[in-house]
């Protein structure tokens, strides 16, 4: 790749970061390359000043510098190969015809014999190196380029992260006190855990330590864990890419074997009877498989129940040991569950509240008021269903006018309905409505409202007419009259009551009757009592 191809890469990538035209991008690249003297750090800083400190801009700068470095190396190789072709003497040509083993075993410090002739013939040309170095380096570079092209982009990112997290001291340590204002914050360790300093990307990547207290931002254990995770992801991606390549190359994938049944018919055999036997056999086999699956399912359920019981017992044991830890774990699980299901848990769909008219009625509303609220709710629900049908494309067309032209052409005009206001008003004009059901409901609503208003007005008049009248209230009650009793009559009544009481006592017989005859025995009297 040449410098022009690097600029072409910039022309493709820069418009994704900033809305610039092709000419502006070319001018920007030429200006940066001319003022930076091919220094990668200066090129990166100037591009970042223009493009901003974002992920896309960092990726673009790294790729651009890589392309420029590859260009320089390739140009040097090409110049060396050209000089070798033009300046190689005859003695070197003869040596190149020797076997490859001798050619490879030659030392790089050997000098050609005819150096004087070379100096005379190539005064304006640079010094020539042995050809074995160039021939050996070319296949290595080609292999590396071939390997890098075959990898995925995500694998390259993982390799870069692994290299960054390797446990080795980097010589180029930089301190940056921007506190994340100029450069983006280091996501892995945004601030130091010892002094609290905010760490930017430059300080985190290049140094790995805090510039204030000189403590490590990431511990050794965390680094090793991150490297293991990245290696695991890399292996997974390599496996997926290899499987995709095998599938694209048409690798043999094992197919599932299909069961086939054959029916042989011979002389004197009924084919339909053989088919019936085969179908019965297949049904019995399926029934056995179904029963087997049921048994396996029951076993799995038993195992799951046993595992749950074991977990519950362990849970209770832990609760007995440390109840505070158990309560904290349950709270954490509940909060994580709420976090996962927050979108569904906070979504409230309450269509009935939009059409609820019970605020006017209350708990002690009359029968007419409740009927009026029900009619309003039914009308609103019907209107809402029509609006939903219109949203789904099953709307009714309302023709306003129909005109017949001179050529016999009929034109019909249609008015779009207002779907924003879903709640139907109870005081709508009947002349503006074309639906017969809606008109009948509205008439009924108006009649109920008029009846309710008349009853309320009559009740108000009745309450207003009620005033306390002393004379009218006095006529409702009669004056009490007191009767005086004579003392003689009271004494006579008392005597008659005493005589009646004595007569009742004389007439009563005792429950236990004992024979008065002396001849009767005591045993008979006891038995009579019992």
UniProtKB/Swiss-Prot annotation:
Residues 88-104, 123-139 have a biased composition (Polar residues). It holds the Pfam family zf-C2HC5. It is found in: Cytoplasm, Cytosol. The modification Phosphoserine is found at residues 426, 431, 434, 457. One of its GO terms (cellular component) is nucleus. The keyword Ubl conjugation applies. Transmembrane segments: none annotated. Keywords: Cytoplasm, Isopeptide bond, Phosphoprotein, Ubl conjugation. GO terms for molecular function: K63-linked polyubiquitin modification-dependent protein binding; zinc ion binding. Disruption phenotype: Defective activation of the ribosome quality control (RQC) pathway. Mildly defective ribosome stalling induced by RNA arrest sequences. Sensitive to anisomycin (stalls ribosomes in the rotated state). One of its GO terms (biological process) is ribosome disassembly. Residues 75-153, 290-323, 479-502 are annotated as: Disordered. Its main location: cytoplasm. Present with 1710 molecules/cell in log phase SD medium. Component of the RQC trigger (RQT) complex, a multiprotein complex involved in the ribosome quality control (RQC), a pathway that takes place when a ribosome has stalled during translation. Specifically recognizes and binds RPS20/uS10 ubiquitinated by HEL2, promoting recruitment of the RQT (ribosome quality control trigger) complex on stalled ribosomes, followed by disassembly of stalled ribosomes. This is RQC trigger complex subunit RQT4.
